[in-house]
Amino acid sequence: MTNPGLRPAAPTHRRNVVLVWAAAVLVLAAVVVLGAIRTAPGSDSHTRDFLTRDFLTGDVLNVAQQQEPGPAESAPAAPAAAAVDLPAEMQRIIGAHPDHRIGVAVLDTRDGQLQSYGDVAPYTAASTAKVLTAAAYYHLVETGDKSLDAPLGAFNAAFQLKAMINTSSDDSWLLLMRDIGYPNLTAYAATLGITYDPEQNLVAPTDMARLLAQLTTGKLLNADHTAELLGYMQHTNDEDLVPAAVAPGITVHHKYGVVQGYVHDAALLSAGDRSYAVVIYTWGPDDADSADRLDLIHDLTHQLTGALFGQ
């Protein structure tokens, strides 16, 4: 005789078995999918973590939508700026001005490598030669032969040095050269490898570049006098030449020179661990203050800084 009270147990048992098998299938499917994701090219830890966290909650469809793009899907990088072919650009600019004399010298102050372009024979140096006069006077101060506090003209020598460099005073220049003595100035220049006659005031762009390089590397003067002279070569009364054409982030110390068709700028340019003496000497039939001459010097400067500093 059977017990009617036990019959309902059979269907319940079958349902439990079905549920167990369904759960097993779901777990197996999860394992398969996780294995595929882990071995798929381009999958990353973010995707695996997301799938492990969300798959068993039934949010499988969101995985593909929330997966971060792999490297192949990243936005393309901006193309690098083309390198400046400096010799070609210098020749292009110089060749476009056949009625001008143009000489450019570039000296790397770290390794002494010198590059020159155009006509680098001596030019009337105009006021760029005032840097040589200043260096000679500071040298005499360091040897004890001169004093910055000594009267010179209506002021003292220190005042005249600053006026000569920072505001390009010709009166101060004459006072300082006479106090040094023209033969002594010539002799001092010779110790630096520069042939210089104050009466003629002729200097080659390459010699001016060497002078600036020796100044900035501390080979001419002591640290205090070097810093003082370089300080006078910033924020001068004419910043329209090289300083007006350099990019932000490039430090400029310079001495310009303008006289009778000659327009020059002798500069030290530095950024980071790079430093160059850059000298641009020009002569032309046009007015020295003409827009064309400014454009010429600015164009040269843009190409130079683009090649030297990438900006």
Q: Locations of the language-model features?
A:
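Active-site SXXK
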Residues: 112, 122-152, 164, 278
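Acidic/histidine-rich, surface-exposed loop or edge segments in extracytoplasmic proteins
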Residues: 59-77, 110-118, 166
